Each structure stands twice: as structure tokens, then as C-alpha cells.
Amino acid sequence: MAATAATTFSLSSSSSTSAAASKALKQSPKPSALNLGFLGSSSTIKACRSLKAARVLPSGANGGGSALSAQMVSAPSINTPSATTFDFDSSVFKKEKVTLSGHDEYIVRGGRNLFPLLPDAFKGIKQIGVIGWGSQAPAQAQNLKDSLTEAKSDVVVKIGLRKGSNSFAEARAAGFSEENGTLGDMWETISGSDLVLLLISDSAQADNYEKVFSHMKPNSILGLSHGFLLGHLQSLGQDFPKNISVIAVCPKGMGPSVRRLYVQGKEVNGAGINSSFAVHQDVDGRATDVALGWSIALGSPFTFATTLEQEYKSDIFGERGILLGAVHGIVECLFRRYTESGMSEDLAYKNTVECITGVISKTISTKGMLALYNSLSEEGKKDFQAAYSASYYPSMDILYECYEDVASGSEIRSVVLAGRRFYEKEGLPAFPMGKIDQTRMWKVGEKVRSVRPAGDLGPLYPFTAGVYVALMMAQIEILRKKGHSYSEIINESVIEAVDSLNPFMHARGVSFMVDNCSTTARLGSRKWAPRFDYILSQQALVAVDNGAPINQDLISNFLSDPVHEAIGVCAQLRPSVDISVTADADFVRPELRQA
């Protein structure tokens, strides 16, 4: 394939880059012409909008207020971030332009037919060091090894672990060994690798990054699957060494999903988990092709561009929101409501967890949120609207706070400190993460699943659908207002939820979903799930019980939101097979496997 011009990106200028990479970066904003979901008017936004919490005073009350009283007001003096086009060039892979609700973006479509191009993408790389063995590392290492073998490449994939790590046995069982040079000490592996994939936990990265940098060869490439380390460095006023390239490939799903869909798709071209990629520093012009090669080798159906900063903000936020924390809060809240209203426990579980992880997820994945709404009866639509109207702003209240905690570095600091509390220190005991599926609700779930017919997607309960979709749409709006691209918004708010994560809760409950994820995700889900549970119980459900009128503007804007068109385009790029997750799955974390 003929080489193109020097690699360029049209990315946000907020990311720090090396001098070499800075020359290749250019910002390419595209004027926004979207109805952003709050007020239904013309598609051209003539006045920017902002949130205002208006105080609603009940008769006889002296004051009060809540997220329910939030409303949109005209604020022409405030600049709304214009949409940014993420463009790039590759000398190896073909990019495609997709239009998402009026915004042009560029992707690389994956597939096993592209594996023969991997040797060109990894030119100059003799060893890929995969450091760690948590959620992502086992999946990525095995996928890389299998893809490179199929491509007849002589690039070595080597696992690097701490001396004495219990994960050595797991890595050996997956086909890596000291004898053939594919398994060893992490520091020796880092020193000997041309591409270092740092897939240890985020808190471990924060505590060990200086030693990692010191062991890397000049002109080698640091690969990340999360922008967390950049956020940590920014909080300290530090940056990456200038003599290495820094890239990221971030699968939009937990590690077990990355491996499972790759294996399922061996007979079907194009199965895997979508990924974003970023080039933060490029010291020799190879970074883009290496990043895209990495993503293709993982089996990503499509790969879209972002920045490390945009990635960590959307990812850390998303997993605390609809992906993990918020959905946990929703089902706990609604299970209590339904049982307290006289519904049987079995039916309440079906109308919450089974409903969301089954028919709701399946419909959104293949047809979108509008199709879900339109499948309801007229009475069902009324219940959906009541739940949606009451839940949207309370959900946005917590989501807004969460995003700002992530963007400010507060949530990153919380993760680092939590990781240090896993061990005894300062005379205080260790506090590892506890279990999250031991309450009555999740025991009921075990019983429901034990008699569930194969392939049963559960009932479609309109009220549950209204709450879930309201939170999903509120998350989309936060990310949209914060300037994220549609491909990132949809993957972090919709696709990852319904195609990667919810199937695990459907198979074996909330812990099976949450605890197969990264440490950062597991911590965030535990921290924020109770916040969503609380605000929905205290504000949304109370409003419904008090007969609060349905906000017809919210419903109208949901029905006409441009995100539906963008989701429709992305649905055409979904994996070629649906993930198959069973309760006895052997591709999950060892501690979560059934005996």
C-alpha cells in the first residue's frame, strides 16, 4: 500500500504532546448544528444553552429545590464547545469517513482479513511486552499472539509480571512460558520490549510509573489502554519522557469480552470489541500505524480516534455512570420500589435486572432507543414517559458531579488512595473491595436464573425502560456538552453497556459484571451506585408518586434527538456476532469462575 503523507491528527489542543507530535497536531472544529436535546427548536443552535437550577417553592414552603427543577435557559454569552473532527492518516490501513448526526468522523474498520498487514504496522518492533495480568492483559496478550501467528509475524508477545506473582500460573495456562521467552519478570520485559503495553491497575501505574519510564528503551513505544496515567501525571504537573512515543488503544469493554468475542469470531470476520486510539507522543512517525495495528490485532470491529485526555474523562465517567455504577443503582432502587408495592420478588427481579440486561439491551443494541420506545403500547409509553421525565434531571445531577470530579482529578486521586488502602499501613488494617451481590435481591436473582429458559430475554417493563433510557440520555448529554465526539459518546454510553457489560449481569448478576472489570471501574461502581440509588429514590420516584406532570419538552427532545441517527450508523458497525456469556464461563477472572 502506498505511503501517505506524515501522520496528522485533528484533535483537541488540550492534550500535552511532545514537540514532534505537536507539529503534526491541528485542531479542526466543525460548527455545531445540533439540537442538543433540551429544547426542541430549529436544528441550528442560535443561542447556547446552559443548566440552571431554579428553586421551586411548594405552597407554604420557605425554600427548597432539586435536580427536578433544572431547566434550560438561553445564555447567548456562553460558548458551547464546537464539535471537533478527529482526522488521521495511516500508511498501512485504510480509513473511512462516517457521518454521525452531521459530524464527519474517521474510523478504521477491522477484520481478520487485515491481519496480513500487521507486520507492516509493527515494522521495527521485535517484542511486545504485555505488563500485568488483570482484566485487559490476558485478553489482549492472547489476541495479539493469535493474530500475529495468523499473520506469520515473528514479533514476540511476552508477559511481564512481578516476581512471585500468583498470575504466573494463569499466564502459563494461557500458553506463555519462561522456556520459550514469552513470560518473565516485568522489569526485564519492559527493558527488552519495543512496544510496552502497560496493563497493570491504574493505582499501580500511579505508584510505579517512574520506574517503568526508567526501564524503557529510547524510541520505544508506551502503550496504554486507559488515559488514567496522563490524568495522574497532570495532577502532579508532570509528563511522559520525551524520548518515547506514547499511544493508547482502549477497548470499549471489559477484558473478558475482548477475548470472548475474538474467539467467537474466529469463523466470522470482524468480531470483537470496538476501540478508541490516541497518539499522545510520536518521536519517529510510527505511532499511528502501531496503534492501529494493535487495535486490529485485538479484533476491534472499528477503531476511532480520540485523545488520552478525552479518553480518561469519558471512560472513568462512563463506568461510574450507565455502564456500571448507575445501572447497579437503578436496579437496586427499582427492585425495592416494586417489592414494596406488592410485586413478588421474582417478578421484581425480572422487571429490573432481566428487563434491562435482556430485551432492553438487545433492542437498543440492534435497533436503538427509539425502537425500544416505539415497541411499547400506548399505556406503556405513558409509564415510560412518567419515569423518563422524573428521572432525567436527578440522574444528570449526579452525572454532572461525577464528570467534574473526574475532570478535576479528584476521582483519579480517589482511585490511587483506594488502591493503597488495599494493604496494611500506618497501623491500620487492609481494606480490599468487598462483595456486592450478597443481599436478598441478588439471591432472588440466582433463583430466577436457575429456572430461566435458554435464550429468555425477560419482560419489557415500561417504567424500568424509562428510568434506564433517561439516565443513558442524560449521560449522552453531559458528554456532548463537554465536547466529546459522537463515536466516543455512543461507545461509552450505549454500545459498551448493551453489547459488552449487561450480558455479564444477565448471566450471573451484578458482581459478575462489575468485578470482571478493571480495579478503577470496580472502585467507581461501588462508590457511585449508591448515589444514583439515593437520588432516584429521593427525587425521581417521589415525583412520580406525587403526580408530578410529565415534562413534555423532555419527551419531545428525546424523540427528536440527533443521537438516534448516530446510534443507527454505529449499529451497522457492531460486532458480527453477539457475545455469548454463560454462568460457567471460563474466560473470566479466576476468582469469578464457578467451581
UniProtKB/Swiss-Prot annotation:
Functional pathway: Amino-acid biosynthesis; L-isoleucine biosynthesis; L-isoleucine from 2-oxobutanoate: step 2/4; Amino-acid biosynthesis; L-valine biosynthesis; L-valine from pyruvate: step 2/4
Binding positions for NADP(+) per the UniProt entry: 129-136, 162-167, 201-205
One GO cellular component term noted in the UniProt record for this chain: mitochondrion
The keyword Cell membrane belongs to this UniProt entry's keyword annotation: no
Alphabetical list of InterPro entries matching this protein: 6-PGluconate_DH-like_C_sf, 6PGD_dom2, KARI, KARI_C, KARI_N, KetolA_reductoisomerase_plant, NAD(P)-bd_dom_sf
UniProt-annotated location(s): Plastid, Chloroplast
The enzyme's E.C. designation: 1.1.1.86
Domain KARI C-terminal knotted: 307-455, 456-592
Active site as annotated: H226
Enzyme class, UniProt record, top EC level: oxidoreductase
Molecular function GO terms recorded: ketol-acid reductoisomerase activity; magnesium ion binding; NADPH binding; protein homodimerization activity
Location of the transit peptide in the chain: 1-72
Cofactor binding annotation: Binds 2 magnesium ions per subunit.
Residue numbers binding Mg(2+) 1: D315, E319
Subunit structure of this chain's protein: Homodimer.
Family membership: Belongs to the ketol-acid reductoisomerase family.
Name of the protein in its database record: Ketol-acid reductoisomerase, chloroplastic
Organism, as annotated: Spinacia oleracea (Spinach)
